[in-house]
């Protein structure tokens, strides 16, 4: 599957406001989302599995890749396209042994050293951040800004997406770095019109 990282949605059910996750993901895809990561913190394995399976029904229908945050077992159980790992999650080399060469593995990085290490270890793409202050992620060590993003982007050759505080007012500045995509949570999920919110983050509307 050819991967378009252009508009990368990360799920967070705290923003649902009573809406169905499947419907929200579908509207986001119809608005222009090109890849979906299912992220669930502090839930049981069974609940995570059920949520991921539900989202995969939508992504399969629209032929959009689905990535699972952190949990290799969930990724395997639903036959996801891949996983996204943080610096403290399963080591990339071990994840590759478990998932095989055909699955996508993305790594979160916050500096050039981490980016080069992930690239050299065989990451398929990088999530670079945190770019701007954000309310979605509380354990942010450092805001790297556009300058930090540019330095990391210039040091690597694999695809990457920017994450952290990206919204409709600043996303064009982020894309000027040549990054392959932007990764968002609240910029889409916290809006009343999901489809329009996604569409507002497309550079070529």
UniProtKB/Swiss-Prot annotation:
Catalytic activity field: 2-[(2R,5Z)-2-carboxy-4-methylthiazol-5(2H)-ylidene]ethyl phosphate + 4-amino-2-methyl-5-(diphosphooxymethyl)pyrimidine + 2 H(+) = thiamine phosphate + CO2 + diphosphate; 2-(2-carboxy-4-methylthiazol-5-yl)ethyl phosphate + 4-amino-2-methyl-5-(diphosphooxymethyl)pyrimidine + 2 H(+) = thiamine phosphate + CO2 + diphosphate; 4-methyl-5-(2-phosphooxyethyl)-thiazole + 4-amino-2-methyl-5-(diphosphooxymethyl)pyrimidine + H(+) = thiamine phosphate + diphosphate
Chain positions recorded as 2-[(2R,5Z)-2-carboxy-4-methylthiazol-5(2H)-ylidene]ethyl phosphate binding sites: 134-136, 165, 185-186
InterPro entries: Aldolase_TIM, ThiamineP_synth_sf, ThiamineP_synth_TenI, TMP_synthase
Cofactor detail note: Binds 1 Mg(2+) ion per subunit.
Pfam families per UniProt: TMP-TENI
GO MF annotation terms: magnesium ion binding; thiamine-phosphate diphosphorylase activity
A single BP term in Gene Ontology: thiamine diphosphate biosynthetic process
Classification via SUPFAM superfamilies: Thiamin phosphate synthase
Keyword terms: Magnesium, Metal-binding, Thiamine biosynthesis, Transferase
EC number: 2.5.1.3
Sequence positions that bind 4-amino-2-methyl-5-(diphosphooxymethyl)pyrimidine: 37-41, 69, 108, 137
Pathway in which this enzyme or protein is active: Cofactor biosynthesis; thiamine diphosphate biosynthesis; thiamine phosphate from 4-amino-2-methyl-5-diphosphomethylpyrimidine and 4-methyl-5-(2-phosphoethyl)-thiazole: step 1/1
GO cellular component terms attached to this protein's record: cytoplasm
Enzyme class at the top of the EC tree: transferase
Function: Condenses 4-methyl-5-(beta-hydroxyethyl)thiazole monophosphate (THZ-P) and 2-methyl-4-amino-5-hydroxymethyl pyrimidine pyrophosphate (HMP-PP) to form thiamine monophosphate (TMP).
NCBIfam families: thiE (TIGR00693)
Family: Belongs to the thiamine-phosphate synthase family.
Protein name per the record: Thiamine-phosphate synthase
Organism: Clostridium botulinum (strain Loch Maree / Type A3)
